[in-house]
């Protein structure tokens, strides 16, 4: 009898060990696959683009055509609404439209609200699926009291603190930036692009985060400088384009309404796909320029300028 009990115990132990080894092997296979997933947005001249299948999509690494390992409609979204605290206080008059945008998001969208100040992101509301709670975090920007900061360094800070649960192959990440784009911390004199722009773009690409930017002027006379504004809009336009999103501005004046911008961004977020490609990043990992096209009529695909291919074993 004791022998049978010992035999049964050994059997349970071996079965448990096999399950653990199988799970470990599966995890190793997944980690060493070298797959990279990134978000692609379908844009149509019509009100809503048609469903896009994997067969409709062409992916290239430079001039080399690549096979798409997986293509699926985006579901889970982590969306951070980041407001430059140096904005003119009249921006708060647009928050009714921003609240409508927040409340229109599907239940699967986790929303955070933060204010960019002192080269960091002051999180007013962490990621939550309670959209009413997120909407309540909106307040009047500080204006002149926040002049002297860099929205680019502030967003890098936010990306460094992005929740690990959001950085999965099955989740999308987006930032909705409302800013003049002016870097008051670094100032001018660095050529057309601010020194922290490229590090921000690379971090966003590595974390598969699209950065949608909406222009609103800063407080004070310095924020009306033609040179600063022209340079800033060049920077935020590149930021959005290189991270697979779009920038919204019409000249350098005070926008009448931000509602059309929020509505369009909402439509884009509802028409996103996750594209997975198998590609080795070598022993160190690397950034790879990509081009994504479709043969579907009247449809354009928006994708980041480059993606990060993880190193073997990541």
Model-derived regions, located:
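Bacterial N-terminal signal peptides
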Residues: 11-22
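Scaffold/interface architecture of coatomer-like assemblies
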Residues: 26-314
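N-terminal secretory signal peptides that target proteins for export/translocation
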Residues: 1-6
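Detector for intrinsically disordered, low-structure N-terminal pre-sequences
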Residues: 7-11, 56
């Amino acid at each position: 009898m004791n022998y049978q009990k010992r035999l049964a115990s050994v059997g349970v132990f071996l079965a448990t060990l096999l399950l653990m080894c199988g799970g470990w092997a599966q995890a190793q296979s997944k980690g060493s696959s070298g797959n990279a997933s990134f978000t692609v947005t379908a844009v149509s001249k019509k009100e809503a683009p048609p469903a896009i299948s994997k067969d409709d999509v062409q992916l290239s690494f430079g001039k080399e055509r690549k096979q798409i390992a997986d293509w699926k409609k985006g579901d889970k979204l982590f969306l951070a609404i980041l407001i430059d605290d140096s904005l003119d206080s009249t921006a708060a008059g647009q928050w009714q439209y921003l609240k409508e945008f927040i409340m229109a998001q599907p239940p699967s969208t986790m929303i955070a609200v933060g204010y960019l100040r002192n080269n960091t992101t002051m999180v007013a509301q962490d990621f939550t699926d309670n959209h009413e709670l997120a909407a309540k975090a909106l307040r009047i920007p500080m204006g002149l009291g926040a002049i002297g900061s860099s929205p680019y360094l502030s967003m890098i800070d936010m990306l460094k603190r992005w929740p690990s649960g959001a950085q999965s192959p099955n989740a999308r990440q987006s930032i909705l930036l409302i800013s003049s784009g002016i870097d008051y911390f670094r100032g001018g004199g660095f050529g057309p692009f601010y020194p922290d722009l490229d590090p921000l773009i690379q971090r966003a690409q590595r974390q598969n985060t699209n950065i949608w930017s909406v222009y609103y002027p800063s407080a004070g006379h310095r924020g009306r400088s033609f040179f600063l504004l022209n340079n800033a809009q060049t920077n935020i336009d590149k930021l959005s384009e290189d991270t697979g999103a779009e920038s919204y501005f019409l000249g350098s004046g005070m926008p009448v309404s931000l509602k059309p911008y929020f509505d369009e961004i909402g439509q884009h977020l509802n028409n996103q796909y996750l594209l997975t490609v198998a590609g080795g990043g070598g022993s160190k990992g690397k950034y790879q320029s990509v081009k994504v096209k479709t043969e579907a009529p009247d449809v354009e695909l928006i994708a980041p300028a480059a993606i990060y291919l993880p190193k073997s074993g990541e």
